[in-house]
Amino acid sequence: MEFFRPTELREIIPLPFFSYLVPCGFPSPAADYIEQRIDLNELLVSHPSSTYFVKASGDSMIEAGISDGDLLVVDSSRNADHGDIVIAAIEGEFTVKRLQLRPTVQLIPMNGAYRPIPVGSEDTLDIFGVVTFIIKAVS
Protein backbone atom coordinates (compact mmCIF):
# COMPACT_ATOMS: atom_id res chain seq x y z
CA MET A 1 0.00 0.00 0.00
CA GLU A 2 1.41 3.38 -0.98
CA PHE A 3 0.60 6.41 1.19
CA PHE A 4 0.52 9.98 -0.15
CA ARG A 5 -0.06 13.28 1.69
CA PRO A 6 -1.83 16.12 -0.11
CA THR A 7 0.54 19.01 -0.67
CA GLU A 8 -0.28 22.67 -0.50
CA LEU A 9 -1.48 23.83 -3.88
CA ARG A 10 -0.06 27.08 -5.14
CA GLU A 11 -3.26 27.95 -6.94
CA ILE A 12 -6.81 26.73 -6.55
CA ILE A 13 -8.23 25.87 -9.93
CA PRO A 14 -12.03 25.69 -9.84
CA LEU A 15 -13.32 23.38 -12.55
CA PRO A 16 -16.69 23.71 -14.32
CA PHE A 17 -19.58 21.82 -12.76
CA PHE A 18 -22.63 21.09 -14.89
CA SER A 19 -25.60 20.47 -12.62
CA TYR A 20 -27.57 18.78 -15.39
CA LEU A 21 -27.96 15.09 -14.53
CA VAL A 22 -26.46 12.94 -17.27
CA PRO A 23 -28.63 9.90 -17.99
CA CYS A 24 -26.82 6.58 -18.14
CA GLY A 25 -29.50 5.17 -20.44
CA PHE A 26 -30.92 6.75 -23.60
CA PRO A 27 -29.12 10.01 -24.52
CA SER A 28 -31.00 13.29 -24.20
CA PRO A 29 -30.04 16.87 -25.10
CA ALA A 30 -27.85 18.49 -22.42
CA ALA A 31 -28.10 21.99 -21.00
CA ASP A 32 -25.46 24.34 -22.38
CA TYR A 33 -24.51 26.20 -19.25
CA ILE A 34 -22.23 25.91 -16.26
CA GLU A 35 -24.08 26.33 -13.00
CA GLN A 36 -21.00 26.79 -10.84
CA ARG A 37 -17.33 25.97 -10.50
CA ILE A 38 -15.99 23.49 -7.97
CA ASP A 39 -12.55 22.88 -6.53
CA LEU A 40 -11.79 19.17 -6.21
CA ASN A 41 -9.80 19.84 -3.04
CA GLU A 42 -12.87 21.37 -1.40
CA LEU A 43 -15.00 18.48 -2.59
CA LEU A 44 -12.67 15.62 -1.61
CA VAL A 45 -10.71 16.96 1.38
CA SER A 46 -12.74 18.07 4.41
CA HIS A 47 -9.81 18.03 6.85
CA PRO A 48 -6.57 18.86 4.97
CA SER A 49 -4.24 18.31 7.93
CA SER A 50 -5.62 14.83 8.56
CA THR A 51 -6.26 13.65 5.00
CA TYR A 52 -3.98 11.42 2.98
CA PHE A 53 -4.17 9.27 -0.14
CA VAL A 54 -3.53 5.54 -0.46
CA LYS A 55 -3.15 3.53 -3.66
CA ALA A 56 -5.15 0.30 -3.41
CA SER A 57 -3.73 -3.03 -4.51
CA GLY A 58 -5.47 -6.34 -4.98
CA ASP A 59 -9.10 -7.30 -5.53
CA SER A 60 -10.51 -7.94 -2.05
CA MET A 61 -12.69 -4.79 -2.18
CA ILE A 62 -14.06 -4.93 -5.73
CA GLU A 63 -17.69 -5.24 -4.57
CA ALA A 64 -17.24 -1.91 -2.76
CA GLY A 65 -16.05 -0.32 -6.01
CA ILE A 66 -12.35 -0.37 -5.07
CA SER A 67 -10.12 -1.84 -7.77
CA ASP A 68 -6.40 -2.50 -8.02
CA GLY A 69 -4.62 0.83 -8.56
CA ASP A 70 -7.45 3.09 -7.36
CA LEU A 71 -6.52 6.12 -5.30
CA LEU A 72 -8.35 6.27 -1.97
CA VAL A 73 -8.95 9.51 -0.08
CA VAL A 74 -8.63 8.80 3.65
CA ASP A 75 -9.69 11.04 6.55
CA SER A 76 -7.79 10.12 9.71
CA SER A 77 -9.78 12.59 11.85
CA ARG A 78 -13.01 10.61 11.51
CA ASN A 79 -13.95 8.02 14.09
CA ALA A 80 -14.52 4.70 12.35
CA ASP A 81 -18.07 3.41 12.69
CA HIS A 82 -19.64 0.04 12.01
CA GLY A 83 -19.80 -0.40 8.22
CA ASP A 84 -17.14 2.18 7.31
CA ILE A 85 -14.40 1.27 4.85
CA VAL A 86 -11.17 1.81 6.75
CA ILE A 87 -7.42 1.69 6.41
CA ALA A 88 -6.39 -0.65 9.19
CA ALA A 89 -3.39 -2.56 10.42
CA ILE A 90 -3.89 -5.91 12.08
CA GLU A 91 -0.76 -7.20 13.73
CA GLY A 92 1.16 -4.56 11.77
CA GLU A 93 -0.14 -5.58 8.32
CA PHE A 94 -1.98 -2.81 6.43
CA THR A 95 -5.28 -3.49 4.69
CA VAL A 96 -8.39 -1.73 3.42
CA LYS A 97 -11.61 -3.44 4.54
CA ARG A 98 -15.15 -2.75 5.75
CA LEU A 99 -15.19 -2.50 9.55
CA GLN A 100 -17.69 -4.68 11.38
CA LEU A 101 -18.12 -3.87 15.07
CA ARG A 102 -21.26 -5.92 15.81
CA PRO A 103 -21.81 -8.64 16.87
CA THR A 104 -18.05 -9.22 16.78
CA VAL A 105 -15.17 -7.11 15.49
CA GLN A 106 -14.08 -8.20 12.01
CA LEU A 107 -12.51 -6.70 8.92
CA ILE A 108 -14.74 -7.67 6.02
CA PRO A 109 -13.42 -8.01 2.45
CA MET A 110 -15.94 -7.01 -0.21
CA ASN A 111 -15.22 -9.98 -2.46
CA GLY A 112 -16.75 -13.40 -1.88
CA ALA A 113 -13.43 -15.07 -2.70
CA TYR A 114 -11.97 -13.80 0.59
CA ARG A 115 -12.84 -14.60 4.19
CA PRO A 116 -13.48 -12.03 6.93
CA ILE A 117 -10.60 -11.31 9.29
CA PRO A 118 -11.77 -11.82 12.88
CA VAL A 119 -10.21 -9.48 15.43
CA GLY A 120 -9.88 -11.06 18.85
CA SER A 121 -9.05 -9.41 22.16
CA GLU A 122 -5.46 -10.65 21.82
CA ASP A 123 -5.05 -9.06 18.35
CA THR A 124 -3.66 -5.59 17.74
CA LEU A 125 -5.97 -3.58 15.47
CA ASP A 126 -5.10 0.00 14.54
CA ILE A 127 -7.44 2.14 12.43
CA PHE A 128 -5.59 4.77 10.39
CA GLY A 129 -8.61 6.46 8.86
CA VAL A 130 -11.91 6.19 7.02
CA VAL A 131 -12.00 6.02 3.23
CA THR A 132 -14.15 8.95 2.06
CA PHE A 133 -13.68 8.85 -1.72
CA ILE A 134 -12.40 6.51 -4.43
CA ILE A 135 -10.59 8.06 -7.40
CA LYS A 136 -10.31 5.81 -10.42
CA ALA A 137 -9.33 6.09 -14.04
CA VAL A 138 -11.98 4.91 -16.47
CA SER A 139 -9.81 4.71 -19.56
Swiss-Prot record:
Main EC class the enzyme belongs to: hydrolase
The UniProt record lists the keyword Protease: yes
Signal peptide positions (record): none
Annotated site (Cleavage): C24, G25
Its job: Involved in UV protection and mutation. Essential for induced (or SOS) mutagenesis. May modify the DNA replication machinery to allow bypass synthesis across a damaged template.
UniProt cross-references to InterPro entries, sorted A to Z: LexA-like, LexA/Signal_pep-like_sf, LexA_repressor, Peptidase_S24_LexA, Peptidase_S24_S26A/B/C
NCBIfam families in alphabetical order: PRK10276.1 (NF007621)
Protein name, entry field: Protein UmuD
Enzyme Commission no: 3.4.21.-
Superkingdom of the source species: Bacteria
Active site: S60, K97
Keyword DNA repair: yes
Gene: umuD
Keywords noted in UniProt: Autocatalytic cleavage, DNA damage, DNA repair, Hydrolase, Protease, Serine protease, SOS mutagenesis, SOS response
One GO cellular component term noted in the UniProt record for this chain: protein-DNA complex
GO MF annotation terms: DNA-binding transcription repressor activity; sequence-specific DNA binding; serine-type peptidase activity
Native species: Salmonella typhimurium (strain LT2 / SGSC1412 / ATCC 700720)
Example of a GO biological process term: SOS response
Family, as annotated: Belongs to the peptidase S24 family.
